[in-house]
From Swiss-Prot:
Pathway stated in the Swiss-Prot or TrEMBL entry: Cofactor biosynthesis; thiamine diphosphate biosynthesis; 4-methyl-5-(2-phosphoethyl)-thiazole from 5-(2-hydroxyethyl)-4-methylthiazole: step 1/1
Name of the protein this chain belongs to: Hydroxyethylthiazole kinase
Similarity-based family: Belongs to the Thz kinase family.
Residues annotated for ATP binding in this entry: R127, S173
C-alpha cells in the first residue's frame, strides 16, 4: 500500500478473509499463562497455531511456519535461546517476526533478554502496552508486572521514535490502540471493552493475531491495523452480548472466541472506529 492510499474497513475485512482462507501456520514461542488461549484464538480466527519451544526443533518449525511470534512473558534461559534459534531461521526465510515485550522494564533479567532479541535484528512488528513500549524505546516507564501504568495515548510519540529508529511497525495497545511505522503512518483504533483487560492473555493473543495477519498481508502496518481492529470490534461485540445476558468475564472469554470465528462483514464495518492520521 502506498503512503497516499487510504486504508478502509473493506481493506481490513479483506485481510480477515485472507486469514480464514489461507489458514497460515503461526509458530509461537509464548508464555505458559496464555499458551492455550492464544492457540484457541488463532484457531477461531482461522489460522493454525503451533507452540514449540524445544531447542532441537524450533529452527525446523520456523522453517515451515508463515510467521513467528516471540513472547517474553514467562522467561527462562532455555526459552530465550530457542527464541534466538527460531528468529535466525525466520530471518533466513524472510517470514514476519512479531515481538511481544511482556513486562519490559520490570526486571534486569527481562531487560537483558529483550535487549538481546532486539540486538539480533529489528522484528517486523512490536506490540506492547504503553509502559512496555516506552521501556523498549529506552525512555523508561513505571511498570507493575505485565500491567501498564500509563495510557496508550501517552506512548504514541515513543512508538513513533522507536519505529523510525529500528524500522519495525510498533503497536501500542490500550483503551485506544495505535499502530505506527517508519514511513510516518499512524492508525488509531478505538473499539474494545474494559472487560477485555480482566481476561488474561488478550494482549498476548493480539500479538499472535498480528502474526497471522502479517503472514497473509505483506504490508506489516496494514496487517497490524487489521488484527487490532478485528480484535477490538469482536471484543466490544462479545462484551455487549455477555452483559446483556447477565453474565461475566468467564463467559466473555468464550464469546470472544465465538466472535473471532463468526463475526460478519456488516457488523465489522458498522462498528469499526478507526482514524488514520495525516
Amino acid at each position: 500500500m502506498s503512503l497516499a492510499a487510504p486504508l478502509t474497513a473493506a481493506d481490513l475485512w479483506a485481510d480477515v478473509l485472507a486469514v480464514r482462507a489461507q489458514s497460515p501456520l503461526v509458530h509461537s514461542i509464548t508464555n505458559f499463562v496464555v499458551m492455550n488461549f492464544n492457540a484457541n484464538v488463532l484457531l477461531a480466527l482461522g489460522a493454525a497455531p503451533v507452540m514449540a519451544h524445544a531447542h532441537d526443533e524450533v529452527a525446523d518449525m520456523a522453517g515451515i511456519a508463515q510467521a513467528l511470534v516471540l513472547n517474553i512473558g514467562t522467561l527462562e534461559p532455555a526459552w530465550v535461546e530457542s527464541m534466538h534459534k527460531a528468529r535466525r531461521a525466520a530471518r533466513a526465510r524472510g517470514i514476519p517476526v512479531v515481538l511481544d515485550p511482556v513486562g519490559a522494564g520490570a526486571t534486569a533479567y527481562r531487560n537483558r533478554a529483550l535487549s538481546g532479541l532486539l540486538a539480533a535484528g529489528a522484528p517486523t512488528v512490536i506490540r506492547g502496552n504503553g509502559s512496555e513500549v516506552l521501556s523498549v524505546a529506552g525512555l523508561g516507564a513505571p511498570t507493575r508486572g505485565v500491567d501498564s501504568t500509563l495510557s496508550s495515548n501517552d506512548a504514541v510519540a515513543a512508538a513513533q521514535t522507536l519505529s523510525r529508529r529500528i524500522g519495525s511497525v510498533v503497536c501500542v495497545s490500550g483503551a485506544d490502540d495505535h499502530v505506527v511505522d517508519a514511513l510516518g503512518r499512524w492508525a488509531t483504533l478505538s473499539n474494545g471493552h474494559p472487560w477485555m483487560t480482566r481476561i488474561t492473555g488478550v494482549g498476548c493473543s493480539a500479538t499472535a493475531m498480528i502474526g497471522a495477519f502479517a503472514a497473509v498481508q505483506p504490508d506489516a502496518w496494514r496487517a497490524t491495523t487489521a488484527a487490532m481492529a478485528y480484535l477490538g470490534v469482536v471484543g466490544e461485540w462479545a462484551a455487549e452480548q455477555v452483559i446483556a445476558a447477565g453474565n461475566g468475564v468467564g463467559s466473555l472469554q468464550v464469546k470472544l472466541l465465538d466472535g473471532l470465528q463468526l463475526l460478519d462483514d456488516a457488523t465489522f464495518r458498522a462498528r469499526l472506529k478507526m482514524t488514520v492520521h495525516g
